[in-house]
């Protein structure tokens, strides 16, 4: 049994992933909102319940409203987190490469079904620290994503079905934090 890559994270694994990323390395961090759910454990258990279904889903990390972390898949594997790339996506996404093979995904518990709520301070602090650690561990650029990698929201690859994912997120604060915390 594996353990969490992030020391503070509760490990609630599932089998919804691509083992060893089919040889690819993570180049992007994708920020998501849960669009409902009340806790990270509830989200992790939902993902686990989809293991043998028609639409298995997962993520690497889930950040609760109070900043507690849950990890569902190893960073060395590609989580079933992003679906496909839709029309209108940012130019660097390849329609021929599954984005899950090159991304690390972080879900943020959001109570609203439309992801319209802001993230509270404890969740924001945990998110910023986790993004920093992921950038350090995987040499991901600490900036907005482009063809070489970086950080963006789910909307970047699927503006049709995920146009409001993650919803409000303190992007400018994140990049300021990442570029002062080296």
Region locations from a protein language model:
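N-terminal catalytic cores of peptidoglycan-degrading enzymes
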Residues: 1-99
